[in-house]
Amino acid sequence: HTKPASIAQHANTSKSVWRYLLAWQITLLLGLNSFLNYIIITWLPSILTETGHSATQAGAYHGAFQIATALPGLILIPLLAKLKDQSALSFILAMLSALSALGLLYMPSFAFVWTLMLGFCSGACFILGLSFISLRTDDSQQAASLSGMSQSVGYLLAAIGPMLAGALHTTTGSWSAPLWLCAIAGVLCALCGLGSGKNTTLAKSANELL
């Protein structure tokens, strides 16, 4: 009775990862997070100076953002070992990224708080996404395929983000549209986190092929 089961499992793991809904959820979690992150890395000083902050403050906040992206590694990695399901954590972190982007727009006097929150949450979502590549796959070959998929889409979105945000700013004359774009990316990232954070694998989710 174990032989047919192993054959079925092999059939599931041999399918292209591009066909799995779960693989796309993980890929877009990483990709949309990179999209948002690179917009902020590129344009944060300009956003801050246009909302009344000095160039010195903008530079300091930009540095704080990049430091904050590294902090989740100290907290999340031990926590991940204790959590079987990371859906709620992924959703909350990505939604906080969306909230922070809107905070920069509508409550710029708290920009330092929003900047730290954005950095921490985007760094955390990145760590979660990378963890899901191994947690949600069934063998090393599948993990390598999913890693390639997520990196190719992720780098594409990361490259598009700053250019699109810059074009929107040039067209509209303000940072409202780019920051709303970041917020929308954060919400979509949160929805992908709900799916990719579930305690399952690609083989177990084979009924959700695209």
Describe the residue ranges of each PLM region.
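Helix-to-loop junctions at the C-terminal end of transmembrane segments
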Residues: 72-85
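Extracytoplasmic gate region of multi-pass secondary transporters
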Residues: 19-73
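Multi-pass alpha-helical transporter architecture, strongest
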Residues: 174, 180-210
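Juxtamembrane intracellular "pre-TM" segments in multi-pass secondary transporters
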Residues: 2-26, 210
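A late C-terminal transmembrane helix in Major Facilitator Superfamily
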Residues: 137-175, 182
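Helix-to-coil boundary motifs at intracellular loop junctions of multi-pass secondary transporters
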Residues: 47-52, 82-83, 132-140, 171
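Hydrophobic positions within alpha-helical transmembrane segments
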Residues: 61-65, 115, 146-150, 178-181
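C-terminal transmembrane helical hairpin of 12-TM major facilitator-type secondary transporters
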Residues: 84-132
